Amino acid sequence: MQDHKPTAGWGDLFAGRNAIVSLTLVGGVALHAINVFIATTILPTVVADIGGMDYYAWNTALFVTASILGSALVPRLLSQAGPRSAYLIAAVIFAAGTLTCGLAPSMPVMLAGRAIQGLGGGMMLALSYSMIRIVFDEALWPRAIGLVSGMWGVATLVGPAIGGVFAELGIWRAAFWSLAPVIAVFTIMAMTVLPRESGSAASNDRLAWPQLILLTAAVLAVSAGSISSEMALNAGGVVLAIVLLLLLATVEKKASRRILPKGSFSIRKLGALYLTLAFLSASVTSSEVFVPLFFQVLHNQSPLVAGYLAAIMGGSWTLGSIGSSGIAAGRTDRVILAAPVMGVAGMVTLAVLIPPGSDGHWYDLLPICIALAVIGFGVGLTWPHLLTRIFKRADAEDQNLASASVTMVQLFTTALGAALAGMVANMAGLTNPGGFAGTAHAALWLFSGFAILSALAFVSALALVRSARQPQPAQC
């Protein structure tokens, strides 16, 4: 007689108590993800109302950087406070940041609200994934992970709609306030259905504060320099960020508490993987920060339409990931190399078509939309295979660290990329001279810069493919 584990279906995930638990977990990710697209959609309207174009990219950079810190706090928060209290703390922080954004009279207050939002949102995001193993049987884990991850696809539909409608009505603040009742319902559900205790021993592990502080400082260095249009100050910010990242690598190699698996700084083992992941991730998540603004100013689109057009890259990323999941192992090298090529082609197309502007007719927008889709789809095609290789190449004792590092690297490159995008846009004239001419010049330089980033992704992907054909070193 053979033992076998029954395959759990979607019906099992939504049966009885599992249904309300599932809704609670997806609620945390949905709130975080929808908020991302709401903010991106309404940001052009926000700066038109309260000013702060110089700090445009800071809204994303600070939000994502705070999300990294929030997600890093979750393991200790779960073990010491328990799931129920952890969710309550995360929801209260997120709500405080959301209300601050909705009441912000100026950009500095808005940025403070976005940082608070990011801290709470990062907690909710990490809690949702961490809770899966606690509240569900192992047979349900793949379904639960798929459901939670799918909320990003839902967010690409819901976020731009909420942000766009309120922006067009001239009440952008209500876009943030509209999240308040949802946060309240989510909190009540969490307090009702989640366990008080996590079932695991209290964690006494120290957080990797030196590395987290250096990551944050690197993003802030670039962001601070980007405020000025002076080349010297911007170059100084970039140089300081590079120095901080080199220091981070030194600290990480010697630290007893690491944030990356062993071998992460070896090109032959994990280094090329992380570089490719970082370059590709930044090319999508950072460039799309300015896309709604470009569509509104240069192509005569409403906030609602601009928000949806900006979400094309994210939606195509999801479709690409789904479509490539069944690709045979022998063909993944070609897929990994294809993604950066698609990125370069798409970015060059955007650099040519977006700056001149148009009246916004469908035939003007169609090639731009195709370019956006090509970029996102290419990253999506290669994403599952990059993650799979990271898990395979990481040492056995580093498997949990490898899983967590993917999210951290993606978030960090998004934050750093947004800061760099803000620097390039400001230097290219987004704020001075501003207007149509300044925005067009910023778009040209921004997409040209991200084309270079995609080209660098090809270089690292080529190194990755070549290293896969050679014996792997144990660590570095």
Locations of regions flagged by a protein language model:
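Alpha-helical transmembrane segments
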Residues: 23-26, 92, 210-219, 341
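Hydrophobic transmembrane-helix bundles of small-molecule transporters
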Residues: 168-276, 283
